[in-house]
From Swiss-Prot:
Gene assigned in the entry: top6B
Enzyme class label: isomerase
Gene Ontology molecular function: any one: ATP binding
Protein name: Type 2 DNA topoisomerase 6 subunit B
SUPFAM superfamilies: ATPase domain of HSP90 chaperone/DNA topoisomerase II/histidine kinase, Ribosomal protein S5 domain 2-like, S13-like H2TH domain
Tree of life domain: Archaea
Catalysed reaction equations from the record: ATP-dependent breakage, passage and rejoining of double-stranded DNA
GO BP terms: DNA topological change
One Pfam family recorded for the sequence: Top6b_C
Oligomeric form and interacting partners: Homodimer. Heterotetramer of two Top6A and two Top6B chains.
Function description: Relaxes both positive and negative superturns and exhibits a strong decatenase activity.
EC number(s) given by UniProt: 5.6.2.2
Length: 622
């Protein structure tokens, strides 16, 4: 009698390893084209280096060297100054999928699943047939270990082809070299250069060096020597737990009583809250957690929603901060205006998250193009699937006309704008394993929208101010053309010297007037008086600079003195009320008439040039 068909089918059924699955489905992880495969590999390696350096409190110094090998392949070398990897862990870190230290850690980090760099090793061996070379050293007195590894896709275990100790001049760090089928592209948004530029903006403490295939070297230098505040690991929050997960936790806990289990397994549950939860669920605080039935566990889960539990702690997050986002944008873009914000932390499904936004306007940015959106998750640039990201949806949902930007068709606005959006969380909800786009979680989208609107209001105030200043500028141009002619005619008629028209211009325009008066004594000494009068309607704050190649004496009030080689910058910080005035006096010794005539122009820092008469104005920072 023939065997039943079910028995024949059973003979063909077998388990597959995760490595085999991704071997046949590598596009899921971002290896679906030659350019993207290279970006994915670089991204995973750089993420690992940044995470390792920050955990060891080392300012990251990362080298990326890319070379073409033959017609279709490239060699990728990523070298860092991190803490290194202990010998026994090197093969597993690079040649075993789903092996890592962060999957169960509830804190903000770039990598989490333990797939990234090992997926690149798998792609390299599939397309180029070569092992991956790894060198790592954990200290100046420790040896450098050199491995060549591949992945056994049948078992998802590392295959070690070479294991040796070598001389390496670095005191500590890791170097990984892979050859793969990929292509290096330039001049487009999705490129290695743009990825590193974006990474440098949100990681201003890192120094990134790129050596391109043609030998060109690009350095993205650090903008700060201050390391990010390290994120702390937290316990899971009750609002983010699902039924099956709670059942598993109850089954395998070492706690003998339900109340202590709740207290020490979840964040923000103290003794009183644990007792309140048990009461709401109708459960005894003394009962053995592992004995709870499915129905009892469901009641416990429902009680989490009934009892008021504080939001999870936010020290598990490490936001960039408004100041460093500003510095990052300022370093990489030549623009006229920058505004930044870091929102207060929020929560979705028990996961804390924070949204940060920066907006840059003007300068050399293209006026007629769509705005440039730079998306980030846990300090990592998101270069692909922009249309499917919650960030993009939030941008498209805003009415940009009220903020001074055009929005043809009601979609993406146009204008000379770079918009940076960073979402940091213990669990960023990506739409796929390739981690290219953030899912449309209502809480996240709302926070992104609020943050964008906050910086956009600042941009709108700036744009309105520019319109006002333009009108003032046009008015002043007319006045400064007409008044000199009137003054000259009057002087000729009365046979007098041509008067200084600056006080008249300042009064008509409502400007800050700055005047220097010098009395030259017979002995060559000069008494200098600088008068400042505010003809405006608001309190004016600024810094007055007098940059001289001389030392001054008998000065009042005392300035801050900055030595500049053979010159001195004398700086007074001033506040002048409407219609108010202030004066600075000092003496200069042994001055000739020519030297007095050559005294440099005074500088006002902190005001627009349209608001100042009689001195050079620089915007600066007060």
């Amino acid at each position: 009698m023939a065997a039943p068909i079910a028995e024949e089918l059973a003979k063909k059924q077998q388990a597959i390893s995760v490595a085999e699955f991704f071997e046949k489905n590598r596009q899921i992880l971002g290896f679906d084209s030659a350019p993207r495969s290279l970006i994915t590999t670089v991204k995973e390696a750089v993420d690992n280096s940044l995470d390792a350096c920050e955990e060891a409190e080392i300012l990251p110094d990362i080298l990326l060297h890319i070379e073409r090998v033959g017609k279709d392949n490239v060699s990728v070398i990523v070298e860092d100054n991190g803490p290194g990897i202990v010998k026994e862990q090197i093969p597993k870190v690079f040649a075993k999928l789903l092996y890592g230290s962060r999957f169960h850690a509830l804190k903000q980090s770039r990598g989490q699943q333990g797939i990234g760099i090992s997926a690149s090793v798998l792609y390299a061996q599939l397309t180029a047939g070569h092992p991956t070379s790894v060198i790592s050293k954990i200290g100046p007195d420790s040896p450098a270990h050199h491995y060549e590894v591949m992945i056994n896709t049948s078992t998802n275990d590392p295959e070690i082809l070479l294991d040796e100790v070598i001389d390496w001049d670095r005191p500590h760090g890791t170097r990984v070299e892979l050859e793969m089928e990929a292509s290096y592209v330039k001049g487009r948004r999705q490129s290695i250069y743009e990825y590193l530029k974006a990474t440098a903006i949100v990681n201003p403490h890192a120094r990134l060096t790129l050596i391109e295939p043609d030998g060109n070297e690009v350095i993205f230098d650090r903008a700060t020597d201050k390391l990010p505040i390290p994120a702390k690991e937290i316990l899971p929050h009750p609002h983010g737990i699902e039924l099956g997960t709670l059942m598993k936790m109850l089954r395998y806990t070492d706690r003998q009583k339900l109340a202590p289990f709740l207290r020490y397994s979840f964040s923000k549950i103290g003794l009183l809250t644990a007792e309140e939860i048990c009461k709401a669920a109708g459960l005894d605080t003394e009962m053995l957690p592992s004995k709870l039935t499915r129905d009892q566990t469901k009641k416990l889960l429902d009680a989490f929603k009934k009892v008021k539990i504080m939001a999870p702690p936010t020290d598990c997050l490490s936001p960039i901060g408004e100041e460093l986002i500003y510095k990052g944008l300022e370093k990489e873009f030549n623009v006229d205006f920058i505004a930044t914000t870091t929102r207060s932390p929020s929560v979705f499904s028990g996961n804390p998250f924070v949204v940060e936004v920066g907006i840059a306007y003007g300068g050399v940015l293209q006026k007629d193009d769509r705005i440039d959106i730079m998306r980030f998750a846990n300090r990592v640039p998101l270069l692909y699937q922009q249309g499917g990201c919650a960030t993009t949806h939030a941008v498209e949902g805003i009415k940009w006309k009220q903020y001074g930007l055009n929005q043809p068709g009601g979609g993406m606005p146009t204008g000379p704008v770079v918009l940076l959006v960073h979402v940091a969380s213990t669990n960023v909800p990506f739409t796929s394993e390739s981690k290219d786009a953030i899912a449309d979680i209502p809480e996240i989208r709302d926070e992104v929208e609020l943050a964008i609107k906050e910086v956009s209001r600042k941009l709108n105030r700036y744009l309105n101010r520019q319109v006002s200043l333009k009108k003032r500028r046009e008015k002043e141009i007319i006045i400064t053309k007409v008044l000199p002619k009137m003054a000259q005619k009057l002087a000729d008629t009365l046979e007098r010297d041509l008067p200084d028209i600056n006080p008249v211009v300042a009064k008509v325009m409502g400007n800050l007037l700055v005047m220097r008066h010098v009395e030259h004594g017979a002995n060559g000494d000069a008494a200098v008086t600088i008068k400042v009068k505010n003809f405006g309607s608001k309190l004016t704050e600024f810094k007055l600079h007098d940059m001289l190649p001389y030392e001054i004496s008998d000065v009042s009030p005392e300035p801050k003195v900055i030595s500049m080689g053979s010159d001195f910058d004398y700086v007074w910080t001033m506040k002048v009320s409407p219609e108010g005035s202030k004066a600075v006096t000092y003496s200069l010794s042994s001055m000739s008439e020519d030297e007095i005539k050559r005294l440099p122009q005074l500088i006002v820092e902190g005001l627009d040039e349209e608001l100042v008469t009689g001195a050079k104005a620089i915007k600066g920072l007060i």
